């Protein structure tokens, strides 16, 4: 399908009862992650670890990070931290481990785009929770997102998120966004515990979990590899082109409809029959992603 390269052109898609949104580069600026979240973590991680270094939860988080990032090895943090310490002793031990931790942090930041199945800093997500709930950080949302969410849900459509970030991180971003709490618009969340975003089977599994055919879902992402995977699973797809996103070749621009914003999205009613199928499948499968709004998140911060 050929597409206009006119940056001002608005593409209108046929209505759909379900929409599946990527986050980074789609609903949210890529720069938000790299220019807001990562610098915040750099500034806060040492103080946070100094306060919580002797807790089993933080040691487990750092161990997960070490295993996820290539070249970091798998030696336990407990081996470096020694016995549990408190107060000044914990701070002293942290200072001794500072080069190790900062090296780990830098590797996490550098490899984030290359490790889509990891939740690197988000595993140490207590920092994010503090950032969002304190109001020091608010999730960036493009200005056309909220009107689109309102319009689509008013038409009866259901909206879902599928991101490399953990479900808990997704809920923090949309729950503490610049536009307020957007979670009421969302019917469910999926992360890479469902499967890799470049694997067609992941999208088939998502459609089955929602309880609709893949053809009933429009998937939106800035990554053409993800759009190809969703299309291979028979989902309708559109490439989202936002400022700062990776450039597309002329050939890539012909593969899928291109959206520069969400003004061309139209919803269709998610019927009672479909909703009933969804509830039945939830009950049968115990799907955690769809139940995320009512149950503890996959990665509880």
Swiss-Prot record:
Keyword check for Hydrolase, yes or no: yes
Segments carrying the region annotation (Disordered) are: 273-301
Q: Where does Mg(2+) bind?
A: 22, 24, 222
Top-rank EC class of the record's enzyme: hydrolase
Show the catalytic activity: 5-methylsulfanyl-2,3-dioxopentyl phosphate + H2O = 1,2-dihydroxy-5-(methylsulfanyl)pent-1-en-3-one + phosphate
Q: Name one GO cellular component term.
A: nucleus
Tell me which cofactor or cofactors this protein depends on.
Mg(2+)
For the keyword Ion transport, the answer is no
Q: Which InterPro entries match?
A: Enolase-ppase_E1 (IPR023943), ENOPH1_eukaryotes (IPR027511), HAD-like_sf (IPR036412), HAD_sf (IPR023214)
| Annotated substrate binding sites | 163-164, 197
User: Under which name does UniProt file this protein?
Assistant: Enolase-phosphatase E1
Species assigned in the record? Monosiga brevicollis
């Amino acid at each position: 399908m050929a597409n206009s390269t006119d940056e001002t052109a608005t593409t209108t898609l046929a209505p759909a009862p379900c929409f599946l949104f990527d986050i980074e580069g789609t609903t949210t600026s890529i720069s938000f992650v790299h220019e807001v979240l990562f610098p915040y973590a750099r500034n806060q991680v040492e103080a946070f670890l100094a306060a919580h270094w002797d807790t089993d939860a933080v040691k487990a988080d750092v161990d997960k990070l070490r295993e996820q990032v290539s070249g970091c090895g798998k030696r336990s943090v407990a081996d470096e931290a020694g016995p549990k310490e408190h107060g000044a002793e914990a701070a002293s031990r942290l200072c001794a481990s500072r080069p190790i931790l900062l090296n780990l942090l830098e590797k996490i930041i550098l490899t984030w785009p290359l490790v889509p199945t990891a939740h690197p800093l988000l595993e140490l997500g207590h920092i994010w929770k503090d950032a969002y709930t304190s109001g020091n950080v608010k999730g960036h949302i493009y200005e056309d997102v909220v009107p689109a969410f309102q319009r689509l849900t008013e038409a009866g459509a259901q909206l879902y998120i599928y991101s490399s970030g953990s479900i808990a991180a997704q809920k923090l971003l949309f729950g503490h966004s610049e536009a307020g709490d957007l979670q009421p618009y969302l019917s469910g969340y999926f992360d890479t515990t469902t499967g890799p975003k470049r694997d067609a089977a992941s999208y088939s599994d998502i459609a089955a979990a929602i309880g609709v055919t893949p053809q009933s879902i429009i998937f939106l992402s800035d990554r053409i590899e993800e759009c190809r995977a969703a299309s291979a699973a028979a989902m309708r797809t559109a490439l989202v082109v936002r400022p700062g996103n990776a450039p597309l070749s002329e050939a890539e621009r012909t593969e899928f409809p291109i959206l520069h914003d969400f003004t061309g999205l139209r919803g269709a009613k998610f019927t009672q029959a479909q909703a009933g199928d969804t509830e039945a499948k939830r009950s049968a499968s115990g799907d955690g992603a769809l139940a995320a709004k009512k149950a503890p998140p996959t990665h509880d911060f």
